[in-house]
Amino acid sequence: MKEAVAESAVGYFSDNVEQFRSLYGTSQGFHERLEIWGRLLRRYSRPGGAAIDMGCGPGVFSFFLADLGVNVVGIDGALDMIQACEAQRAKRGLTNVRFIHGTLPDIDETTLEHADVLISSSVIEYIEELDETLALFARLVKSRGTLIISMPNVHSLSRSYQRLSNWISPRSDVYRYIRHFSSPRQLERRLAPYGMKLREALYYTHITRLARAMRTLRLPRRLTEDLFVGVFEKTAGN
């Protein structure tokens, strides 16, 4: 059953490669995501450093890091995504980024160097084996390195509505594959056994009618925004 769920999610993204690539250029919600993630990637990466992009999708953040001079490995379970990324890499003539086909959490760690920064944007909520995946991430981060992860916000009012409506009438889009919701502190508790400590968290949202309505209420962002990104540091000696 776990494999079937994973394959369904991977299949959905594989079937929509161009759609997800174009969203970063056309969708207000994806533009907001890129702006927030861009700030974090500039802050926590350095030229010549090593980065891993787990669940790289169409490679938006992998190429962003590569353009900053970072050595990047992008990994995704959708083969069509990887092929599209490799075509883009070849077209641009980049030598500091490469892409690997692999499904979480069954990644061959021996093929990867430990990373100064490991990122995973809107990926782990689809993975049944959440703790196993987080343990893998932590192992791949260097001591005092940085782990940046985004997940659906469990406190979001719009997410609560989505969960209820999906339970009443299952949706046909990507939301039906979501398995996990969290908060920054809940995620920190899951990562604590691996020496990871929360440094900062930012909230953002998909720009839907419901999200716009939530923002007009002037409630705390942890209630109005349906996604968060947490930045974790691996403490010395771990």
Residue ranges and their predicted role:
Residues 122-126:
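Short catalytic micro-motifs in class I SAM-dependent methyltransferases
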Residues 58-106:
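Class I SAM-dependent methyltransferase SAM/SAH-binding core
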Residues 170-186:
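Acceptor-substrate binding/catalytic loop of class I
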Residues 1-45, 48-57, 148-170, 214, 218, 222:
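Conserved class I S-adenosyl-L-methionine
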Residues 119:
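A conserved beta-strand element that flanks and buttresses the S-adenosyl-L-methionine
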Residues 131-143:
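A short glycine-rich, Lys/Arg-flanked "PGG" loop and its adjoining helix->strand segment in the class I
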